[in-house]
Design a protein with these regions (language model features):
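Conserved Class I SAM-dependent methyltransferase catalytic core
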Residues: 159-208
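A short beta-strand submotif of the Rossmann-like class I SAM-dependent methyltransferase core
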Residues: 131
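Short glycine-/acidic-enriched loop or helix-start segments at secondary-structure transitions
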Residues: 34, 140-141, 197
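Conserved S-adenosyl-L-methionine
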Residues: 2-114, 120, 124, 128, ...
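Short, surface-exposed linear patches
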Residues: 72-74, 150-153, 208
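Mobile active-site "lid"/loop adjacent to the S-adenosyl-L-methionine
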Residues: 134-167
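Surface-exposed acidic, glycine-flexible loop patches that form ligand/cofactor-binding
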Residues: 119-121, 177-178
Length: 208
């Protein structure tokens, strides 16, 4: 859980404006979204808030949190496949769509090609991403055989070239790829991603 003082600080810096779309890909109880709405004194469009979580109870609490703070129109979805927003993204109509792993004949969404869709649907890009995802060595992702194709949709998974990866790294790429051009992002991550040698690929990728 992110302390409210930190959330307040981050929202003040990012400073969401009217007509901007906002997402928390690991929404929890939607504190980032609710604080953004409250701080705007209701001037932000309540239809422009989006969130995803793997826990149905969290999504219920998030929806209630937004409602109690005056936003009854936020789009907050549960994706209880254990992957949440790692695999599921919003399309431009506000519906969840899944990444498509490569096949022998098609690259599909392999290695960050998330806009390469044969179904004609377009990935929704957001003006603002605010999130505090799971991260750290204890929260490493070790994809099973079924999920490996999804992992390969992430360029950083392929760059790291290991059998496991810090979830914070995956959620970092996830946040960047759903961010609109000239958008603003705030993500709470471990200091290690910004400093230690084993995460140099993440830093290099982010600066490219």
């Amino acid at each position: 859980i992110t302390p409210l003082q930190i959330i307040d600080f981050i929202v003040d810096i990012v400073n969401p404006k009217n007509n901007e779309t906002i997402i928390d890909p690991t929404v929890g109880i939607a504190d980032f979204l609710s604080v953004s709405y409250v701080k705007s004194n209701g001037t932000l469009d309540d239809k422009n808030f989006y969130g995803v979580d793997i826990d149905e109870d969290m999504v219920k609490l998030a929806t209630l949190n937004m409602l109690l703070n005056g936003d009854g129109n936020a789009t907050i979805e549960v994706q209880s496949d254990g992957l949440g927003s790692i695999n599921s993204k919003f399309d431009d109509e506000g519906n969840l769509i899944k990444l498509v792993p490569r096949t022998e004949k098609q690259e599909h969404n392999y290695n960050g090609l998330w806009d390469n869709r044969v179904d004609g649907k377009q990935l929704k890009k957001f003006d603002i991403v605010l999130t505090n995802p799971p991260f750290g060595e204890a929260r490493s992702w070790v994809p099973n055989t079924t999920d490996l194709g999804i992992a390969e949709c992430y360029e950083l998974w392929n760059r790291y070239g290991q059998t496991k990866i810090d979830l914070g790294v995956i959620f970092l790429e996830n946040a960047v790829r759903v961010l609109a051009d000239n958008g603003r992002m705030a993500i709470v991550l471990s200091n290690s991603i910004a400093s230690i040698a084993s995460h140099k690929e993440a830093r290099k990728w982010l600066c490219e």
